[in-house]
């Protein structure tokens, strides 16, 4: 016993720090990924709050027409946003010390880059921390794999898309209306609604919601009665109990008769894997779609694809969408260019006649 106590006392400060960082007994697990996650997310959150409240207008298009995004400059919670870094900066790394003054840094939208880069580092480390805690506890690694879907989506809109388009000014603004503006412009320029990967993402999100509601309602409807009519059904469950709290056979029988037998899972493990995999794979595909459209590999173009025997166009819904796209495109960044590329003449008229 004496020897053991002596060894503990001789443990270095660094050793004790390592043990504390990797201890699963802490109320909140830190982990080595947490060492980087905590400061980056705190920085991103702090700057976001300050900038959302008080940042001055930003020259997003690089044409000396600042756009207001903060509460103190006339916005509300819905219209407010962190305005993306100016097109004049492009993809340049733009920390505070690269600007001539803090006023210049704010005018060119420096906070957006600061927030986005710290945020992406932070959420990537959060994903690593999920894996790390799973590893320490002897669990399988699929929690971190599932979280990779929103991480991929955030990376696509905040980093990959600006890289492909050549400027952080094309990144998604950090606000409600700014997000909607990003979506509308993205549709106008890339026809995302006609991209199969976006369609898979829609199926993933809506399908995941449907399956979650179906599973929750089936389980809630087939609980094993443990309470009286005067008590909440939730009182019939005790945390850590070994026996099942619902009758999976009854749920399987109900759903199998409602649809057909093989539409219902008879294995709880495969069911829950499916519930996790469906939305995750869908969001993976959407992130991949955003990342390809970043480099202008756009959605399908079926414009004027149906003609009659005289060669006259018979409009389809694809043509209606195209008309809407053109309308959205001519209205955004209206002072940054005279007309969008889609409306430009295919050939320049010859000056020699």
UniProtKB/Swiss-Prot annotation:
Protein's recorded name: Photosystem II protein D1
Organism, as annotated: Oryza sativa subsp. japonica
Assembly notes: PSII is composed of 1 copy each of membrane proteins PsbA, PsbB, PsbC, PsbD, PsbE, PsbF, PsbH, PsbI, PsbJ, PsbK, PsbL, PsbM, PsbT, PsbX, PsbY, PsbZ, Psb30/Ycf12, at least 3 peripheral proteins of the oxygen-evolving complex and a large number of cofactors. It forms dimeric complexes.
Transmembrane intervals: 29-46, 118-133, 142-156, 197-218, 274-288
GO molecular function: chlorophyll binding; electron transporter, transferring electrons within the cyclic electron transport pathway of photosynthesis activity; iron ion binding; oxidoreductase activity, acting on diphenols and related substances as donors, oxygen as acceptor; oxygen evolving activity
Phylogenetic classification of the source organism: Eukaryota, Viridiplantae, Streptophyta, Embryophyta, Tracheophyta
Cofactor comment: The D1/D2 heterodimer binds P680, chlorophylls that are the primary electron donor of PSII, and subsequent electron acceptors. It shares a non-heme iron and each subunit binds pheophytin, quinone, additional chlorophylls, carotenoids and lipids. D1 provides most of the ligands for the Mn4-Ca-O5 cluster of the oxygen-evolving complex (OEC). There is also a Cl(-1) ion associated with D1 and D2, which is required for oxygen evolution. The PSII complex binds additional chlorophylls, carotenoids and specific lipids.
Compartments, as annotated in UniProt: Plastid, Chloroplast thylakoid membrane
SUPFAM superfamilies (UniProt xref): Bacterial photosystem II reaction centre, L and M subunits
Encoding gene (name): psbA
Swiss-Prot/TrEMBL keywords: Acetylation, Calcium, Chlorophyll, Chloroplast, Chromophore, Electron transport, Herbicide resistance, Iron, Magnesium, Manganese, Membrane, Metal-binding, Oxidoreductase, Phosphoprotein, Photosynthesis, Photosystem II, Plastid, Thylakoid, Transmembrane, Transmembrane helix, Transport
GO terms under cellular component: chloroplast thylakoid membrane; photosystem II; plastid
Binding site for [CaMn4O5] cluster: 170, 189, 332-333, 342, 344
Entry's EC annotation: 1.10.3.9
Binding-site residues for chlorophyll a PD1, renumbered to this chain: 198
């Amino acid at each position: 016993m004496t020897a053991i106590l002596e060894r503990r006392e001789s443990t270095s400060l660094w050793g004790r720090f390592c043990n504390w960082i990797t201890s699963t007994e802490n109320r909140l697990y830190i982990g080595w990924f947490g060492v980087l996650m905590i400061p980056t997310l705190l920085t991103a959150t702090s700057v976001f709050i300050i900038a959302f409240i008080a940042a001055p207008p930003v020259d997003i298009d690089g044409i000396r027409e600042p756009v207001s995004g903060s509460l103190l400059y006339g916005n509300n919670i819905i219209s407010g946003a962190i305005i993306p870094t100016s097109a004049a900066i492009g993809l340049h790394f733009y920390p505070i010390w690269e600007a001539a003054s803090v006023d210049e840094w704010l005018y060119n939208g420096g906070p957006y880059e600061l927030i986005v880069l710290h945020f992406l580092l932070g959420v990537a480390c959060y994903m690593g921390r999920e894996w790390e805690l799973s590893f320490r506890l002897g669990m399988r690694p699929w929690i971190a794999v599932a979280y990779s879907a929103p991480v991929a989506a955030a990376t696509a809109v905040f980093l990959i898309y600006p890289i492909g388009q050549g400027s952080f000014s094309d990144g998604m603004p950090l606000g409600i209306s700014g997000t909607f503006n990003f979506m509308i412009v993205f549709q106008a320029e890339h026809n995302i609604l006609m991209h199969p990967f976006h369609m898979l993402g829609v199926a993933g999100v809506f399908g995941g919601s449907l399956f979650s509601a179906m599973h929750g309602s089936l389980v809630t409807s087939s609980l094993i009665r443990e309470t009286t009519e005067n008590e909440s059904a939730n009182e019939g469950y005790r945390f850590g109990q070994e026996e099942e709290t619902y009758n999976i056979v009854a749920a399987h029988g109900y759903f199998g008769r409602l649809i057909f037998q093989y539409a219902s899972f008879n294995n709880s493990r495969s069911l829950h894997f499916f519930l996790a995999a469906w939305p995750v794979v869908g969001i993976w595909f959407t992130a991949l779609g955003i990342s390809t459209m970043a480099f202008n590999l756009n959605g399908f173009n079926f414009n004027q694809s149906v003609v009659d025997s005289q060669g006259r166009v018979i409009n389809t819904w694809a043509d209606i969408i195209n008309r809407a796209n053109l309308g959205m495109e001519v209205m955004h960044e209206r002072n940054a260019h005279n007309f969008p590329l889609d409306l430009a003449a295919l050939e320049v008229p010859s000056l020699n006649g």
